[in-house]
């Protein structure tokens, strides 16, 4: 089987947006116009093709990023066939891990904005993630038919808030109820879509006279941006010669691919206007796998190597999503960066040092699947039959090993105890939780050693709620869930030296002897734990030094204040002694543990609590109530601004997570259900003394017993 589409005609794109900007509807229209779905799925009827998990349909929000393949020949049928792989990404803050994960494997993104709401809190998070992975993007201002729609305001917000160089390549014809179509600034023609054919047919018309001056003004700005792509275009532009349509497009393309500009389009996906032209813009301006730099990884000796997006290079791919499918079991979604792989081939997972046989390879369309025999560089597909794999692992040709950069995942900030209702549920729950943790690296499962309870941790209340819900639906596990618990941390504030730990047992026969002297220092936030060996003259033999490190590491899990994990400390092994016969690894491990506990007590230990960045959008009448309530939750209000279009106020604050439980219910009653909020983890901060004392007292007996 040979390649159906050359790699230059591939587009791997993500569609990202703030919740409710109409992203799922936009994706639906793409599937419709590219000829895959024949009835348009509407989100508000719970029937969208991409939202394929039951909870998504009920909640009307997209949770799992499904990958879909579509083909496009241009809205006027004037392009060779292009293959567009779309990764649908969630717009809810609790699911940013999904967005981060898909950004890693995309070549380009289409950012969808609501014409009224504009740039919203989640849009900023998604933008930062796209910057982190260097993903070129175009912007689509959706819902132009809404009351208060303002395309140019969104353009200003992208420039001011996101610091993106937003370049309109279209302007709207009308707005709100009178939104009819767009002016294509490259062709200088109006595009009007036909309602009767659900937007499949369209016609070019002359620009309405009242828009002519505005169109010329924005076209001039666009041409200036395009001309800056290279010397030849700039020279031609500066000498006053007109640039051709192809020259404008190639200039805009070069600057978009280089992440210098963001072409902007508009439309109303719901009213079947604009999505078709946005698909053309994906082809015109977003990169193919061949336009982005080669992927860099490391070989087994940790030397840097690269792979180019070509079929004749050795096979390399990244597993970016793992899902359990009710029909075929575990599905591993992967992006092929180089080479070709056939079903039945063996590939190596170098991070697990394990060879895996690819059973079947499936190409997905939402939750429909087509079996294919091989995949090529640039493809996105799903494999069945891979046993041991975690999100972010590399799959590679066993004869030419490469380890691609691992993704980084945030630490969970909220925990809950979860208990099976019956004995039968108990066994199923273990299997279900392990499956879910394998699919979602921001979800953790552990057993509390004291209480024996199973503790689940995640990125927010909604995140855990949905995972418990999935346990019930997909695995038939009925479980009771405890009150959410905050993931506190402990650290130290001062340096202590000469902290001694001695573990000696000599009672006939072979004894135990380990003796260490440690120095403890606070590290800057986020630096984590660091161990330094400063032993001179072999007073502690080489072979016992890893045991000292291990002893400290094990003790980090339970701090001395309230038994929470310890972060951001530097431990230096400065001195010690040993016994020729009685010393062993275990003795040094115990000595290090004793020394660390003692040192921590002396180093001014403090309790840290997670602080959340909270944004509340509220009608103006309730602003005082909202701010007062946030302050009563120990929140620091950091700013307030008008929501464009007379839509009330946006209040930004930093609030401890411990004070935010059940906030959605309180906010509803404070504002008669008219305010919305979003929240994401910001950083850890020292808890005030009286708060810390309460937490320590509540955990006191346990911590005292542990100490």
Swiss-Prot record:
- Tell me which Pfam families the record gives: EFG_C, EFG_III, EFG_IV, GTP_EFTU, GTP_EFTU_D2
Q: Give start and end of each tr-type G domain.
A: 8-290
Q: What gene does the UniProt entry assign to this protein?
A: fusA2
Cellular component, GO annotation: cytoplasm
Q: Which cysteine residues pair off into disulfide bonds?
A: none
UniProt keyword list: Cytoplasm, Elongation factor, GTP-binding, Nucleotide-binding, Protein biosynthesis
- Biological processes, Gene Ontology terms: ribosome disassembly
Which PROSITE patterns does this one have? G_TR_1, G_TR_2
**MF-aspect GO terms:** GTP binding; GTPase activity; guanosine tetraphosphate binding; translation elongation factor activity
Q: What does this protein do?
A: Catalyzes the GTP-dependent ribosomal translocation step during translation elongation. During this step, the ribosome changes from the pre-translocational (PRE) to the post-translocational (POST) state as the newly formed A-site-bound peptidyl-tRNA and P-site-bound deacylated tRNA move to the P and E sites, respectively. Catalyzes the coordinated movement of the two tRNA molecules, the mRNA and conformational changes in the ribosome.
State the compartments where it is located. Cytoplasm
Matching entries from SMART domains are given as:
EFG_C, EFG_IV
Q: Where does GTP bind?
A: 17-24, 88-92, 142-145
Write down what this protein is called. Answer: Elongation factor G 2
Its signal peptide is: none
Q: Which superkingdom, per the lineage?
A: Bacteria
What the record says about family reads: Belongs to the TRAFAC class translation factor GTPase superfamily. Classic translation factor GTPase family. EF-G/EF-2 subfamily.
């Amino acid at each position: 089987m040979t390649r159906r589409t050359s790699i230059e005609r591939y587009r791997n794109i993500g569609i990202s947006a703030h919740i409710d900007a109409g992203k799922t509807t936009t994706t639906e229209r793409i599937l419709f116009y590219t000829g895959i779905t024949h009835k348009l799925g509407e989100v508000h009827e719970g029937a969208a093709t991409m939202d394929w998990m039951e909870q998504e349909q009920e909640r009307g929000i997209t949770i799992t990023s499904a990958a879909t393949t579509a083909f496009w020949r241009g809205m006027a049928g004037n392009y060779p066939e292009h293959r567009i792989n779309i990764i649908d990404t969630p717009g809810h803050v609790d699911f940013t891990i999904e967005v981060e994960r898909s950004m890693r494997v995309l070549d380009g993104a289409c950012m969808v904005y609501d014409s009224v709401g504009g740039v919203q809190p989640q849009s900023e998070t998604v933008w930062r993630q796209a910057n982190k992975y260097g993903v070129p993007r175009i912007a689509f201002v959706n819902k132009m038919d809404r009351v208060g729609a303002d395309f140019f305001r969104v353009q200003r917000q992208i420039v001011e808030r996101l610091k993106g160089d937003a370049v309109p390549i279209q302007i709207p014809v009308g707005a709100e109820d009178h939104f009819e179509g767009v002016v294509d600034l490259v062709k200088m023609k109006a595009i009007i879509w036909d309602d009767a054919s659900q937007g499949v047919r369209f016609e070019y018309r002359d620009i309405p006279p009242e828009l002519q001056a505005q169109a010329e003004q924005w076209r001039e700005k666009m041409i200036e941006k395009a001309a800056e792509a290279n010397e030849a275009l700039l020279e031609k532009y500066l000498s006053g010669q007109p640039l051709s349509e192809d020259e404008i497009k190639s200039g805009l393309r070069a600057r978009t691919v280089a992440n210098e500009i963001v072409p902007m389009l508009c439309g109303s996906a719901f009213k079947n206007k604009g999505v078709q032209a946005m698909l053309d813009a994906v082809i015109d301006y977003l990169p193919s796998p061949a336009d982005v730099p080669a992927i860099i990884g490391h070989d087994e000796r940790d030397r840097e190597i690269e792979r180019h997006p070509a079929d004749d290079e050795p096979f390399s791919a990244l597993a970016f999503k793992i899902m359990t499918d009710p029909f075929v079991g575990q599905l591993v979604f992967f992006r092929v960066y180089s080479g070709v792989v056939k079903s039945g081939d063996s590939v190596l997972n170098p991070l697990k040092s394990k060879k895996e046989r690819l059973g079947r390879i499936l190409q997905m369309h939402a939750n429909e699947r087509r079996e294919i025999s091989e995949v090529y560089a640039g493809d996105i597909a799903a494999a069945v039959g891979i046993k041991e794999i975690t999100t972010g692992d590399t799959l590679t040709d066993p004869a030419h090993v490469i380890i691609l950069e691992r993704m980084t995942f945030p630490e969970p900030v909220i925990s809950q105890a979860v208990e099976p209702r019956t004995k039968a549920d108990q066994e199923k729950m273990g299997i279900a939780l392990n499956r879910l943790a394998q699919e979602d690296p921001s979800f953790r499962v552990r057993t509390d050693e004291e209480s024996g309870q199973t503790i689940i941790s995640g990125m927010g209340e909604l995140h855990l709620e949905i995972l418990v819900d999935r346990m019930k639906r997909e695995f038939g596990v009925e479980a009771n869930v405890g009150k959410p618990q905050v993931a506190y941390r402990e650290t130290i504030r001062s340096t202590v030296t000469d902290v001694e730990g001695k573990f000696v047992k000599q009672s006939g026969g072979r004894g135990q002897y380990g003796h260490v002297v440690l120095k403890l220092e606070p590290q800057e936030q986020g630096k984590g734990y660091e161990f330094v060996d400063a032993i001179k003259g072999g007073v502690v033999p080489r072979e016992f030094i890893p045991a000292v490190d291990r002893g400290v590491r094990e003790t980090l899990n339970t701090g001395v204040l309230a038994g929470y994990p310890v972060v951001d400390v530097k431990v230096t092994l400065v001195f010690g002694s040993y016994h020729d016969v009685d010393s062993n690894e275990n003795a040094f491990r115990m000595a290090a543990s004793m020394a660390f506990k003692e040192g921590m007590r002396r180093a001014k230990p403090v309790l840290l609590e997670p602080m959340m960045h909270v944004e509340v959008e509220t009608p103006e009448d309730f602003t005082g109530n909202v701010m007062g309530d946030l302050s009563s939750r120990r929140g620091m209000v950091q700013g307030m601004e008008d929501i464009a279009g007379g839509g009330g106020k946006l209040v930004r604050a930093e609030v401890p997570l411990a004070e935010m439980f059940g906030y959605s219910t309180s906010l509803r009653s404070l504002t008669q259900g008219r305010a919305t909020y979003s929240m994401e983890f910001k950083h850890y901060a020292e808890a005030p003394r009286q708060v810390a004392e309460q937490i320590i007292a509540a955990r006191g007996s346990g911590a005292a017993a542990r100490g």
